[in-house]
Amino acid sequence: MEVTTNPPCNTALLEEYIPSGENPWTSQKIKHLYRRLAYGVNLAGIDATLPLTPATVVDSIIDTAINLPQTAAPSWGYFSISDFADFDLENPANVSQWYIQTAGDTIEGGLRARLTMFWMNHFVTELDSYGSYAPYMFQYYNLMQTHALGNFKEFVRAVGVNSTMLIYLNGFENTSNNPNENYARELFELFTLGENNNYTQEDIIQASRALTGYNHWDDPGAQIYFDQSTWDESPKTVFGSEEFYTYDELIDTLFELRETEIAQFICTKIYKYFVSHQYDVITQEDIINPLAQTLIDANFEMAPVLRQLFKSQHFFDDRALGIVIKNPYDV
C-alpha cells in the first residue's frame, strides 16, 4: 500500500460535517460533492442543494444510486453463439451499441455509474480474452451495476462464477485433473487481500482446487455453470484450515479468517478513488481503518461505509477539494 510518513495535508476526521460560520456549506463544497459522487452539477442543482444539510444530500445521492434500476438487458444479452443469425456481422454491431449505451449510463448514472466504473477497474477483465463477445460484456456490466453499492462479500462470490471472469482468468479451464491457479491468485492479490497480504503460495494452490468445477456450458457463448464431475472433492487446507471446501465455503472462509485485511484493502481503494490517491499512516489510522471497521460491522455492506466517508469532515475539508485527477468523463 502507498502509505507515506509525511504529515497529511487533510487532518480532518470522520466526524460528520456540520456547517458552521467558520466552515460554511458553500457552492464550492456542493460542486466538490457532485464532482466526486457524480459528474458535476449545474447552477440550478447548486441552488436546490444549498438549503439542505450535507448529510441529507449525501443520503439522497446514495439512496438514489441504490434504487436506480439496472440497465435493461438487450435482446442479445444472454445469447449463445448459435442464437445469432450471423455472428460475425451481429456481434461487432452489438459491441458498438453497448459502448454507446454504457457511455450514456456513465454520464447520467451519478454515484452508481461512478462505482460501476470503480468496480470494473477493480474486478478487471480484458475484452480480447473472451473475443469481445457482446453477451459477456453485458453480463459483466450488469453484475457491476447490480452489486455497485451492495454487499462486497456477495459481490466477490458472484464475480468468481461470472462467465466473463471464468474465461478471463481461466476458471473455465480449472478442473480437478488440471487445476489452474490464475483466479485464486487474483482473488487474493487483486480482489480481496492485496499483494502479499497474509496469504501464501500454498494457499493459492489449495484455493484453486476449491474453485474447480465451473467448466460447462450448454452451447459456446452460453452462461458457464458448475458440474460436480470436474470439481476437486478432496480436502484442501487454506489459511491453515482443512476442509473439503466448495466454492461458497472458500469465499465464506476467506471473509471469516481475513476480514480485517479485506476491509482495509477495499477501504483504502475507496479512499484513493473518492478522496485522494496519496495518504499517510495518520490517514490510515484515523480514516481508513475506522472505515474498514464500519465495513466489518456492517457485514461487508458498502453503503454504510460510503455514508460515513461522504458525510465526514474529512471528505468536505477544504484541503480535499480539487486534488483528484479527472478522467475523460469529468471534462
Where are these regions (language model features)?
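Short, flexible active-site-proximal loops enriched in glycine and acidic residues
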Residues: 111-115, 127-135, 176-179
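Structured, charged N-terminal subsegments at the starts of enzyme catalytic cores
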Residues: 84, 94-113, 117
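His/Asp/Glu-rich metal/cofactor-coordinating catalytic motifs and the adjacent surface-exposed loops
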Residues: 2-87, 91-95, 135-141, 145-331
